[in-house]
Every structure is written in structure tokens, then in C-alpha cells.
């Protein structure tokens, strides 16, 4: 039977519940347990798919095509379990389902209330998402005390009672601030946060004390006394120089032993050797490169969370320190390509909307003409095709219909029909809703032998995740190919362009899919690894 660890946060937001939860999950997995994770988001949106990157950060796409919270990216990077649409749900999705049932008459005329109807649906989804895992860690978004979180907290209170204390525990993250003038950490915010939890019937079993300084034994003893938590279960988690140290930090304080004993699980000791290798490669690089990342959401780098981590993983794989130079594409429009000078490679990620697109196209032109290694992702592939059409074919009005519907050479256009991962045909028009209407999830891609992308993957067929509604226009493709642009990857039915490569260039690859969603610190990703190798070769050539 599945054991549940419910994870909440208090005092302030952004304490790192997702990373702390994923780190504990990684230790339990290293002990031979089957682990999964869920994220419960209190906002009213059905999913984050249409939310601004500046508000929400990255939208992480699962293998089965769900648009989810970026924490699911942390989960997949720390454990081997593949997340699905069942691993993330929101208040909006819960209410949508309950209201649909009410409209069908499933409740037989009952008055629909938060308790029991909404809380029952939350519990049902938690149990379904946990599946047959030995341990399921369930993270509740937001901060204890928020109005939005109350139905979720009530649901886990009920579920703890229903499954019993041997199968459910509560882990609470809290802030223990260090006051420099006093030279000590303060426990009062933690005491008040736990008091808030207890007022709604939830007693934490574990406290993770986040701080920029070690939380000393005296402070931990005081916290244990006033919160009714065992002293051994009050864990100090200070800031670290790489998040991949955290499993070892939690293991050293016996957190996994406490969990295993509490649940009565029989399992092996934790083998963290893989994480030790990751940390060693991260902190002891043998080489160094600088890569320009040209995007449009640079004010909130969480919008590119998986991509930034994927570049870090590629550095780990190549024993190379990867310095990312974050460049707003609008700055290139205003200041020119001087911002790109001296870099070893250029990366253009995905995005939506007209703003900053011309700056991205300029960055592509700089990379192509100056033989600088280039990797384009999603929109980064589309602007590569636009740049090639404008500056090689001479189609000066070439564009995407996303940005200019009147373009005389719409080399990129809306996908109106395609097959999804199940083989079902999806149809879209300009009038379709924005939410949940993109080409989403894992799709097969056929690679051309002898291409650079084939050299990276070392296989003929790959599976990568997608999130886009525009594609290269097949009607103009023959002229583009004739001018020299190489199509090195196509969809499984050969109908859609998935990867392009520039001719006469040391390393210029652009893909329609999002390889960052499947990169992990232990395994890296072949495309990013190949990109960093190309950047390293460029750096050594300049030296």
C-alpha cells in the first residue's frame, strides 16, 4: 500500500518545497523504493498553459502532453519516475470536474459544497496520482494561511485520518531567518507557522528549516519543543552551491531513516554514489565556455528553468563550466550584435508573440554568418528558417503567420492538422481556444543519417516532447531545401519538419521540440551535450 508524505510551506513562498521534496524522493528511490510525486496548485486556472511566463515561470510538458507546473521538472530531474497529467492538478481543474458532474446530474440534486464534494475530488486525484508507488510525496502549492490552499489542506487532513498514521505524514518547510546584528537564527516565525497548521488540524511530523546559515542544535531543540515535533525530525537545510547536494544533506541528517522507520518499510540503505558523481563533475570542471542565451523573458529566468538546468547537465557531462550570458532579444534590436561578440555559442529558446522576434532573427544571422555554434529550440527553429529565407533565398518579407498574417512568404504557419501520440487526428484553426490546443507531449522524430543531430543521438528514431502551434510551411519547403537548408528530422509520418541544419557551418542545429524537458543531471541529454562540445571546440579554436 502507498505511503503518503504531504509537503507544505510556511512563513514565505519560494522556500524550495519542490526541490526539497524531490531530494527526499531521490534518497528514497536510492533505497530501492518506488517513488512518485504530485503537485497540487491552488490557483483557479485549469492549467498553467495560458499563464504569462512572467507570473508563473516555465510550463513543464509531460510525456503524455500535460501542461504543468515547473516543479514537475524538478521531480523528473531528481527521480526516474516519468510524470503524467495525473501528477499535477489545480483548483480550477477540480472545480471544472465537479461542476461537469453536477451538470450531468451525478450528484442527484445535492447541494454542491467545498466539503465534501471538492475535498473528495482532491482526495480521489491524490490516490489516483499516487498509483502503485511505495511512497508518494504530495506537494501543496502556496503558503499555509492562504485562502486558496484551504480545500487542499482540509483534504489532506481527511486523507491522513482515513489511511492512518502508519501511511501518512506531514513535512513542513519553514523559514528560520538569521539576524546578522544579533548573530543568531530566529525560531518564532516557524513556531507561528506550525501554530497556523495546527489550527486547521494538521500536526507536522517533519520540519525542514530553510536558512542561509546552519540552524544550530540549540535552535532545533527549541523548535522541536514548541512545535511538538521530534528533535531528530527537525532538519536544517541551508543554502548550497548546487541543488544536487541536497539529497546528501538530508541523508546526512537521517531524514530518510526517520521516514522509513515511521512507515515500517523494509528496504536497503541509500546508495547516493550517482549524486556524488554529479556534484563532483559540477563543482570540479576541467573546461569553461560562454554561451549567449537570447530570449524574451529574461526578467524571470524561471521561464527557462528546464533549459538552464539542461545546459548545466551538459556541462556536467562534458566536465565543463557553462557560463550563460542572458541577453534580452529586444536589446539586440536596440543595440545590435555587439552583445554577442566573444561568445562560444548562441542558444535561442522558445517563446510566443511578436515582441523581441527581430532580435532573435538577428542573433540567428550572426551565428550563421560568423560560424558560431547555434542551437534553436521551438521558436528558435522557426526564426532560423525565417532568417534563412530572408538572407539566403532573398525573401525579405519572409515571416511566420503568428507575427504577420499578410506576409508574402509565410515560411512558418499554424498547424491545422496532425496526429497526436495516440494516433488520433487533431484539428486546429485560428479561432481555436488558446488553452490546451497546441501540439503537446511526446512525439516520434525520424533523423537523417549523417546529420549532426543523428551524430548526437546515435539513433534513427527519437522521442521528444512538443509544445507549439506553428510549424514550417510545407508549401514553401521545396525552395528552402533547394537553397541549402537541410531537413535532418521529420515527424513519424514525415509531414512536419522537426529539425533543420544550416549548410557549411561547424554546428548549426535547430529543433521544433523541447529536449530540455527530458534532460537529467545523471544522464544529461545528447543534443545539449553535443552543443556544449561544439561550444568547447569553438572556444579552443579562438584560444
Swiss-Prot record:
Binding annotation for ATP: 14-19, 71
Q: What is its EC number?
A: 6.3.4.2
Description of activity control? Allosterically activated by GTP, when glutamine is the substrate; GTP has no effect on the reaction when ammonia is the substrate. The allosteric effector GTP functions by stabilizing the protein conformation that binds the tetrahedral intermediate(s) formed during glutamine hydrolysis. Inhibited by the product CTP, via allosteric rather than competitive inhibition.
Residues that bind CTP, according to the entry?
13, 146-148, 186-191, 222
Which residues make up the binding site for UTP? Answer: 13, 186-191, 222
Cross-referenced InterPro entries, in alphabetical order?
Answer: Class_I_gatase-like, CTP_synthase, CTP_synthase_N, GATASE, GATase1_CTP_Synthase, P-loop_NTPase
What's the short name of a Pfam family annotated to this entry? GATase
EC class (word): ligase
Note whether ATP-binding occurs among the keywords.
Answer: yes
**Pathway(s) annotated for this protein in UniProt:** Pyrimidine metabolism; CTP biosynthesis via de novo pathway; CTP from UDP: step 2/2
Q: Which residues bind L-glutamine?
A: 351, 379-382, 402, 469
Region of interest: Amidoligase domain: 1-265
Where, by residue number, is the active site? Answer: 378 (nucleophile), 514, 516
Record: residues binding Mg(2+)? 71, 139
Q: What are the alphabetically sorted keywords of the record?
A: ATP-binding, Glutamine amidotransferase, Ligase, Magnesium, Metal-binding, Nucleotide-binding, Pyrimidine biosynthesis
The record's GO molecular-function terms, alphabetically, read: ATP binding; CTP synthase activity; glutaminase activity; identical protein binding; metal ion binding
Glutamine amidotransferase type-1 domain span: 290-541
Q: Does the keyword Acyltransferase apply?
A: no
Q: What else is known?
A: CTPSs have evolved a hybrid strategy for distinguishing between UTP and CTP. The overlapping regions of the product feedback inhibitory and substrate sites recognize a common feature in both compounds, the triphosphate moiety. To differentiate isosteric substrate and product pyrimidine rings, an additional pocket far from the expected kinase/ligase catalytic site, specifically recognizes the cytosine and ribose portions of the product inhibitor.
Function statement: Catalyzes the ATP-dependent amination of UTP to CTP with either L-glutamine or ammonia as the source of nitrogen. Regulates intracellular CTP levels through interactions with the four ribonucleotide triphosphates.
Q: Quote the subunit structure annotation.
A: Homotetramer.
Homology family: Belongs to the CTP synthase family.
* Name assigned to this protein: CTP synthase
| UniProt organism field | Pseudomonas fluorescens (strain Pf0-1)
Amino acid at each position: 500500500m502507498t505511503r503518503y508524505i504531504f509537503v507544505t510551506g510556511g512563513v514565505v513562498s519560494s522556500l524550495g518545497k519542490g526541490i526539497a521534496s524531490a531530494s527526499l524522493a531521490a534518497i528514497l528511490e536510492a533505497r530501492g523504493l518506488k517513488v512518485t510525486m504530485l503537485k497540487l496548485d491552488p490557483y483557479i486556472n485549469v492549467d498553467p498553459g495560458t499563464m504569462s511566463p512572467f507570473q508563473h515561470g516555465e510550463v513543464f510538458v509531460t510525456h503524455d502532453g500535460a501542461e504543468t507546473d515547473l516543479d514537475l521538472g524538478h521531480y523528473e530531474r531528481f527521480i526516474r519516475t516519468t510524470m503524467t497529467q495525473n501528477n499535477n492538478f489545480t483548483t480550477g481543474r477540480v472545480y471544472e470536474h465537479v461542476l461537469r458532474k453536477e451538470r450531468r446530474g451525478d450528484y442527484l440534486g445535492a447541494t454542491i459544497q467545498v466539503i465534501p464534494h471538492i475535498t473528495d475530488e482532491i482526495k480521489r486525484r491524490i490516490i489516483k496520482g499516487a498509483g502503485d508507488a511505495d511512497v508518494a510525496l504530495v506537494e501543496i502549492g502556496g503558503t499555509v494561511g492562504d485562502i486558496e490552499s484551504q480545500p487542499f489542506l482540509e483534504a489532506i487532513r481527511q486523507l491522513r485520518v482515513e489511511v492512518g498514521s502508519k501511511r501518512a505524514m506531514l513535512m513542513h518547510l519553514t523559514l528560520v531567518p538569521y539576524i546578522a546584528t544579533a548573530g543568531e537564527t530566529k525560531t518564532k516565525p516557524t513556531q507561528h507557522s506550525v501554530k497556523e497548521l495546527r489550527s486547521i488540524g494538521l500536526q507536522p511530523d517533519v520540519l525542514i528549516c530553510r536558512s542561509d546559515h546552519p540552524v544550530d542544535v540549540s535552535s532545533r531543540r527549541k523548535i522541536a519543543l514548541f512545535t511538538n515535533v521530534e528533535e531528530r525530525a527537525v532538519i536544517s537545510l541551508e543554502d548550497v552551491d548546487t541543488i544536487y547536494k541536497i539529497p546528501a544533506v538530508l541523508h546526512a541528517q537521517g531524514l530518510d531513516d526517520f521516514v522509513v522507520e515511521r512507515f515500517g518499510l523494509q528496504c536497503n540503505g541509500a546508495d547516493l554514489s550517482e549524486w556524488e558523481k554529479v556534484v563532483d563533475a559540477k563543482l570540479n570542471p576541467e573546461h569553461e565556455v560562454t554561451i549567449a542565451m537570447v530570449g524574451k523573458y529574461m526578467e524571470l529566468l524561471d521561464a527557462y528553468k528546464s533549459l538552464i538546468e539542461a545546459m548545466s547537465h551538459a556541462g556536467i557531462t562534458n566536465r565543463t563550466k557553462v557560463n550563460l550570458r542572458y541577453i534580452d532579444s529586444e536589446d539586440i534590436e536596440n543595440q545590435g550584435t555587439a552583445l554577442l561578440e566573444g561568445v562560444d555559442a548562441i542558444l535561442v529558446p522558445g517563446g510566443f508573440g511578436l515582441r523581441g522576434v527581430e532580435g532573435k532573427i538577428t542573433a540567428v544571422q550572426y551565428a550563421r554568418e560568423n560560424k558560431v555554434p547555434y542551437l534553436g529550440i521551438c521558436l528558435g527553429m522557426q526564426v532560423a528558417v525565417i532568417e534563412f529565407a530572408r538572407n539566403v533565398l532573398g525573401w525579405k518579407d519572409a515571416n511566420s503567420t503568428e507575427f504577420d498574417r499578410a506576409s508574402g512568404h509565410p515560411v512558418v504557419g499554424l498547424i491545422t492538422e496532425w496526429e497526436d501520440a495516440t494516433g488520433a487526428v487533431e484539428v486546429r484553426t485560428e479561432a481555436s481556444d488558446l488553452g490546451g490546443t497546441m501540439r503537446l507531449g511526446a512525439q516520434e522524430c525520424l533523423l537523417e543519417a549523417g546529420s549532426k543531430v543523428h551524430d548526437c543521438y546515435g539513433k534513427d528514431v527519437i522521442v521528444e516532447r512538443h509544445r507549439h502551434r506553428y510549424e514550417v510551411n510545407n508549401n514553401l519547403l521545396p525552395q528552402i531545401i533547394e537553397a541549402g537548408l537541410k531537413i535532418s528530422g521529420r515527424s513519424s509520418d514525415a509531414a512536419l519538419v522537426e529539425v533543420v541544419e544550416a549548410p557549411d557551418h561547424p554546428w548549426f542545429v535547430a529543433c521544433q521540440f523541447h529536449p530540455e524537458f527530458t534532460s537529467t543531471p545523471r544522464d544529461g541529454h545528447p543534443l545539449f551535450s553535443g552543443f556544449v562540445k561544439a561550444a568547447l571546440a569553438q572556444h579552443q579554436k579562438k584560444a
